[in-house]
């Protein structure tokens, strides 16, 4: 079998150092370790589009993805830091969509992942492990099989308006409704989520301990600020 990956990052042009360092280390780990034991071929490619229209740029990136022979797409946002093994963890679940859970970039605002019934946010804590069905996780670090985009029609990433909250929705919400209607499961990976941070004024981790990255020539280590 083959695992042909495209990493896609729609960017505003402000890629964080933590994102860049994490991406380099992920690619190095990918080059040295098989995704699956039976994988005879694995390749990796990277594409980005810079601009303020994140929703439309996601759409363009997926169009290009579908014109290739890639089997999987990995969305990574420009403000994410991650362990180099994170891709292997989510890919190892062998599910159509597996994403990571991470705190929003506001202290106390909670996690991005929304429960399947859409009544509460999913919490990742010390007791959380494995994967859990979700309505969506967000696209901060999210692996999606090619077949998902072949089963649902464009537009994939519409911006909507919630008449109850009086707020505009993000593009992942529209995508989540489409995959849910198509019967495609979306999972949050709690194990992978514990290697993810959301980079803002501070690095927001799953346990919401404010931490800062210490980058060395050999590895990335984390210490409390």
Located regions from the model:
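Conserved donor sugar-nucleotide recognition element shared by glycan-biosynthetic enzymes
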Residues: 54-58, 120, 172
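N-proximal low-complexity "stem/linker" segments adjacent to membrane-targeting elements
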Residues: 1-51, 56
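Conserved catalytic core of nucleotide-sugar-dependent glycosyltransferases
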Residues: 62, 83-161
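Anion (oxyanion) recognition and catalysis
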Residues: 40, 91, 179-180
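Short beta-strand-to-loop acidic/aromatic patch adjacent to the donor-nucleotide binding site
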Residues: 70-81
């Amino acid at each position: 079998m083959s695992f042909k990956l495209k990493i896609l990052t729609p960017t505003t042009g402000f890629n964080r150092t933590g994102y860049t360092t994490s991406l380099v280390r992920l690619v190095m780990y990918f080059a040295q370790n098989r995704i699956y034991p039976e994988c005879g071929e694995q390749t990796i490619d990277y594409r980005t589009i810079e601009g303020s229209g994140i929703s439309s740029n996601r759409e363009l990136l997926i169009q290009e993805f579908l014109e290739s022979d890639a089997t999987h797409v990995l969305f990574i946002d420009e403000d994410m830091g991650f362990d180099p093994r994170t891709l292997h963890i989510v890919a190892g679940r062998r599910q159509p969509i597996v994403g990571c859970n991470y705190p929003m970039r506001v202290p106390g605002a909670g996690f991005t992942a929304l429960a399947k019934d859409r009544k509460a946010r999913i919490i990742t804590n010390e007791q959380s492990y494995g994967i859990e069905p979700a309505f969506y996780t967000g696209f901060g670090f999210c692996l999606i099989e090619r077949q998902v985009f072949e089963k649902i029609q464009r537009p994939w990433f519409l911006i909507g308006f919630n008449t109850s909250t009086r707020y505009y929705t993000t593009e992942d919400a529209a995508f989540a409704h489409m995959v849910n209607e198509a019967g495609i499961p979306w999972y949050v990976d709690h194990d992978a989520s514990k290697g993810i941070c959301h980079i803002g004024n501070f690095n927001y981790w799953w346990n919401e301990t404010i931490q800062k990255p210490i980058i060395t020539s050999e590895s990335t280590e984390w210490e409390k600020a």
